[in-house]
């Protein structure tokens, strides 16, 4: 028969007699002493080592957390430094690019001015040569005109002299 399926009256009847549910004899203090002794033994054998282990683990975790926090701060600081260096490098690069563009524009302007000067000089030289050729051609034409006019005169006067 199961203890839980018994009615309350039967349970009380069993407890009144010897060997019932509760017997108040030397067993109860002995069990209390065993319980206290077991608690003390477990405290020294089990709970304290586990407590020490947990404390060590907590100290280890806290140490790692503080190290990680310090390293995170250091990494943030390095990141800021690198970003500043990158910003400075970009500014330097932009400055170099601007200087190179200015220098290239100056070189182009100088070469363009030199090319214009050379072209003007060439045009002037060609104009002088053309003027010289024109003068030469005019002198030759004048000489031919003089010869032709002399020839025409002779022919005209020569015909009149024959008439």
UniProtKB/Swiss-Prot annotation:
PANTHER family in the record: ATP SYNTHASE SUBUNIT B', CHLOROPLASTIC (PTHR33445:SF2)
Keyword tRNA processing assigned = no
Name under which the protein is recorded: ATP synthase subunit b', chloroplastic
Please name the InterPro entries in this protein's record. Answer: ATP_synth_b, ATP_synth_b/b'su_bac/chlpt, ATP_synthase_B_chain
Q: How does it sit in the membrane?
A: Single-pass membrane protein
Query: Its biological function?
Result: F(1)F(0) ATP synthase produces ATP from ADP in the presence of a proton or sodium gradient. F-type ATPases consist of two structural domains, F(1) containing the extramembraneous catalytic core and F(0) containing the membrane proton channel, linked together by a central stalk and a peripheral stalk. During catalysis, ATP synthesis in the catalytic domain of F(1) is coupled via a rotary mechanism of the central stalk subunits to proton translocation. Component of the F(0) channel, it forms part of the peripheral stalk, linking F(1) to F(0). The b'-subunit is a diverged and duplicated form of b found in plants and photosynthetic bacteria.
Q: Would the keyword Transport be found if you checked this record's keyword annotation?
A: yes
Assembly behavior:
F-type ATPases have 2 components, F(1) - the catalytic core - and F(0) - the membrane proton channel. F(1) has five subunits: alpha(3), beta(3), gamma(1), delta(1), epsilon(1). F(0) has four main subunits: a(1), b(1), b'(1) and c(10-14). The alpha and beta chains form an alternating ring which encloses part of the gamma chain. F(1) is attached to F(0) by a central stalk formed by the gamma and epsilon chains, while a peripheral stalk is formed by the delta, b and b' chains.
Q: What else is known?
A: In plastids the F-type ATPase is also known as CF(1)CF(0).
Query: What one GO molecular function would you report for this record?
Result: ATP binding
The primary location reported for this protein is: plastid
Pfam family name, one: ATP-synt_B
Key words, A-Z: ATP synthesis, ATP-binding, CF(0), Chloroplast, Hydrogen ion transport, Ion transport, Membrane, Nucleotide-binding, Plastid, Thylakoid, Transmembrane, Transmembrane helix, Transport
Chain segments annotated as transmembrane: 26-46
């Amino acid at each position: 028969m199961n203890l839980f399926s018994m009615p309350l009256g039967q349970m009380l009847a069993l407890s009144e007699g010897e060997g019932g549910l509760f017997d108040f004899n030397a067993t109860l203090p002995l069990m209390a002493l065993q319980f206290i002794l077991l608690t003390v033994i477990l405290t020294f054998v089990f709970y304290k080592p586990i407590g020490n282990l947990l404390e060590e683990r907590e100290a280890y975790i806290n140490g790692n957390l503080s190290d990680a926090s310090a390293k995170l701060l250091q990494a943030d600081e390095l990141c800021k430094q690198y970003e500043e260096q990158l910003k400075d490098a970009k500014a330097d690069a932009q400055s170099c690019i601007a200087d190179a563009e200015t220098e290239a524009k100056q070189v182009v302007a100088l070469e363009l001015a030199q090319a214009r000067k050379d072209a003007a000089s060439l045009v002037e030289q060609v104009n002088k040569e053309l003027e010289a050729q024109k003068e030469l051609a005019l002198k030759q034409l004048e000489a031919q005109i003089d010869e032709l006019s002399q020839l025409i005169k002779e022919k005209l006067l020569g015909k009149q002299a024959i008439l």
